[in-house]
């Protein structure tokens, strides 16, 4: 019996050992964060550089704001450039389209053939709208055509260890002031209301501007593994000239020095970096100031602003843990006043579950100049001679977030930022303008800003890509004496900024030939300054407010202003005239051949274009169709030298 028991014990142990499969499970998922911004859903056409993929995309959607044409490159990345030029599938394309109502589109992109030393080409884009207002709602507003024409030339010279890059860009933006509503042009206030809808008067309220941008720089091609000093230095110049002869010169110098080293001979690295920035702005305004002892001499007023910033940082990395420490030292000079809003730089990144759950928290700051160029691109309907340009400072900005993958085809990213801001700019309807169709810029002296963003990107099935974005954006003003708290018109509300924004975009590729796209954007809970026509009151000798009467005994009417919200009723219980932002569109592309593509887009189906700044519905629905022709993949044959043949007799 004892022997049987021993044999059975050995047998069970053997079976158990056999059932135990020795293997290692590794949750290693390569994660590439895909950050999407809901504002990108409605961006206008961009000239995609085809070097990054073989399949070219031609997406076009109307944007509620004018596109930003900043000729300065993005953030400098250390040691990421491969000195070899990638071969293009098609290095050139031309795109033409025409839409309803009267919206021509033209694009051209050209690039030289594969060359290990040189890279040069051009990008051209034009989109405009010239149709008269269409529909019952649109006809309440005056005719306000727009046009956007951009040209960018670039040239790069690639050496063994460095790359010389340069570009020259020009943009002409045509924008009439917002199409003012006929509800405001009343005979009681304006003796000849038809005058304001004539072509002669419309030409007098143009707000066109020209932008010239030049950039030249030199950066190293070393990778992070090479123990060499990396550098990137560039000089840029921006010139703005408006229809009202306001001028802005902007000159900048950006520099970066970095060095990478191993961290104590273990699996980590040290990264040392110093960023240098110098910016100078010269603004010349069309209004004149008296000069001389008797004030008889007039000179165009000019403002000068200067910014110098030095930011040294150190980064340490061990596996999935990263630490960055540094300090930012900006020096700001404006109106004979110098400021130095120093801010800390610190960030911790932790890969809690590698590729699945990554956490980061940090603190930083920023100082930037509210330039005329930035204001015109964000809102081209600002008033002329807007001479209240300032530096916006943020000395403490706390941020954090989580990102990773839920599945192999689903990425997520949630981030939040809480900042203490000074001199934060906001747009406000210019109450001094005759037709209430242009905007001023006001500043909150002190306040805090909360910005929370969430993104979910998902490849639901093969060739079906979905992205959902959400944003919560709010402001809290701290200074009891700042503009918002002291001015009774606004009631201390941040104007024209939706507190909530939700965006969606999707793409489906069927049979590698048909591409279907859809996008949507919703923005709500925003405040706006709404002009209304109401009787004029005055205070009599007894202190009582009584209506002002004309010679016939009729009440005199004037313009009053209410601060209204798109989801809240007015204090009198009436529904607000401010509507939420609602914009969605669909698109279709048919890849006829490898070179020909036909496309059709329906934009602004909700007819809410250009309503970011209260109810100026200049544009309705837009349908645009066109074709794209790609070329430039053919082999370039070398030229043969011509030889003179000897005639035979």
Predicted features and spans:
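Hydrophobic h-region of N-terminal signal peptides that target proteins for export
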Residues: 10-18
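Outer-membrane beta-barrel translocator/receptor signature
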Residues: 75-76, 85-94, 98-136, 145-149
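Residues on the lipid-exposed face of transmembrane beta-strands in outer-membrane beta-barrel proteins
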Residues: 108-112, 122, 151-157, 214-222, ...
